[in-house]
Amino acid sequence: MGQLKLKDLYIGKTDGYNEFLEYGSDVCRNLFFEYPNLDISKLLDGSVYYICGDKGTGKTMLLKYVESLIADNSDTNFSQFIRFKKDVDEDQRNQLKRAALPQAPFEEIIESEIPTDTTIDCVLAWQVYLIKVTVNRLKATECGVFERNDTWSKLCSLLDAIYNDKNDTNPLKKILPKIKKGNVEITAASVAKLNLDLEWTDDSKKAVPFVNVGKKVVDLYSSLTPCENRIYVFVDELELSLKKTKKYERDITLIRDLIFAVQYMNEISKLNGYNVFLITAIRNEVYQHVKSKGLEINKPIHDFGIQIDWRQKGGNIQEHPLLKMLARRFQYSEEYHGLTPTPNIYSNYFLPE
């Protein structure tokens, strides 16, 4: 029988994110077992950017593993991790829906309610947020990914003007600037030097429609000059609220449009030669619920996604990927306790059939 005692066997956490927090990237990388049908290089080069699978199939662990690979070259590769469930709170989710509402007499009522109309388009709001996250991460670097030229300066200044929060300690938390009746409050002085054609809603030039300023952000971002180095933005925990609630209907729209926003941002990167890669993990149940509403998200998922499914049809049961994963944890535990890794854990730790 094997030398390892049961109490010394490392099984791990039920959640991949918690495992990385508890044990660190080095341990988790040693334990990581690559999904057999996935070429990691396709995630790194942007060929695949949707990771789909049932709950507990290892989507978060895969994201964190890729993030750890990027960290090996932290001088040339940058990353940012967003957790939808944690970083996008209730107020921000409601505000995202309101940002997409057209100007109409009922807007003042909508402001205090949870918008549930699934025909509302929130893609632009998500794009602005993802651009802000990318820019804020790169602001911490002196160079890399984009040339620090006039267009870059304009984009940074415009984002600063519309968010107008110098004390924002966590840029992930604030999804959108303050929006009232579809308009963003901006002072003319803050954008006077940017030479942008903004559609002011009043003579005093204190407010601009979010749609107008949002498109300016996307246009400026699409006009940046790429350079060396890469940045990866990971979006995880795309989960729905409980069924039969307004929050559930709202989240369906938000997740649908976030999926499209990730696609559009990656398209901008490919068209302009940007080394900016967005990767997101999506639960199958979320995908099915969104699709059941008649929302056409199947094409981008099929074209740019990978399905994690550990089921094995036929063959040697000992070659099952999940059992190989378990064997790896036995061997890691042995190494950790100074023992020689067992070549065959089945013959050493389990009774014969």
Segments (PLM) and residue ranges:
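The catalytic "switch" region of P-loop NTPases
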Residues: 214-232, 237-353
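Phosphate/oxyanion-binding active-site loops and adjacent basic polyanion-contact surfaces
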Residues: 24-25, 58-59, 122-130, 202-214, ...
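Generic hydrophobic, helix-prone segments enriched in Leu/Val/Ile
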Residues: 9, 162, 188, 258, ...
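Long, acidic, intrinsically disordered low-complexity segments
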Residues: 40-84, 202-220, 307-336
